[in-house]
């Protein structure tokens, strides 16, 4: 493998979501956004709910987008592994399902705020963030 190429694997309990070569990866970690290049220093860190951007070596102008709902990223040599609760490529996102999830979360958030249930507010805010992330990533089709 070329020194300018790495392998990215995104794995969820449902299986492998993504397994391709990449030139550059952008991810939002719990410490902020990072850009990942081949042969970077090894690290393991948590991921936020956000989009993952992958530049592939087979087409310099093409970027793959993946909705990642948190998880852990490990960078070691030229292998980047992400283990997440759930992840979807932009082309695989069911937009109408994501829109319904957003509407449900917004309604549940109104109720939780009216009832002043702080734990429920936090839970629903995460659900809303996931739905918005999926909608954002799906817009890159």
From Swiss-Prot:
InterPro entries: ATP_synth_F1_dsu/esu (IPR001469), ATP_synth_F1_dsu/esu_N (IPR020546), ATP_synth_F1_esu_C (IPR020547), ATPsynth_dsu/esu_N (IPR036771)
TM region positions: none
Main location (coarse class): membrane
Gene Ontology MF annotations: ATP binding; proton-transporting ATP synthase activity, rotational mechanism
Keywords on record: ATP synthesis, Cell membrane, CF(1), Hydrogen ion transport, Ion transport, Membrane, Transport
Cellular location(s): Cell membrane
Recorded GO CC terms: plasma membrane; proton-transporting ATP synthase complex
Gene3D superfamilies, per the entry: ATP synthase delta/epsilon subunit, C-terminal domain, F0F1 ATP synthase delta/epsilon subunit, N-terminal
Covalent S-S links between cysteines: none
Membrane topology: Peripheral membrane protein
PANTHER family: ATP SYNTHASE DELTA/EPSILON CHAIN, ATP SYNTHASE EPSILON CHAIN, CHLOROPLASTIC
Protein role: Produces ATP from ADP in the presence of a proton gradient across the membrane.
NCBIfam families: ATP_synt_epsi (TIGR01216), PRK00571.1-3 (NF001846)
Subunit and partners: F-type ATPases have 2 components, CF(1) - the catalytic core - and CF(0) - the membrane proton channel. CF(1) has five subunits: alpha(3), beta(3), gamma(1), delta(1), epsilon(1). CF(0) has three main subunits: a, b and c.
Record-stated family: Belongs to the ATPase epsilon chain family.
Protein name per the record: ATP synthase epsilon chain
Record organism: Lactococcus lactis subsp. cremoris (strain MG1363)
């Amino acid at each position: 493998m070329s020194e300018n190429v790495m392998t990215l694997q995104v794995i969820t309990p449902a299986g492998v979501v993504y397994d391709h070569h990449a030139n550059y990866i952008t991810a939002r970690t719990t410490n902020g956004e990072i850009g990942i290049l081949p042969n970077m220093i090894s690290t393991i860190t948590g991921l936020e709910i956000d989009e993952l951007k992958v530049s592939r070596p087979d087409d310099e102008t093409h970027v793959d987008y993946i909705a990642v709902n948190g998880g852990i990223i490990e960078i070691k040599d030229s292998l980047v592994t992400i283990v997440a609760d759930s992840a979807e490529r932009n082309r695989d996102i069911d937009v109408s399902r994501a829109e319904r999830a957003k509407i449900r979360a917004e309604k549940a958030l109104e109720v939780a705020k009216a009832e002043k249930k702080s734990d429920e507010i936090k839970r629903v805010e995460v659900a809303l963030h996931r739905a918005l992330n999926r909608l954002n990533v799906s817009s890159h089709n």
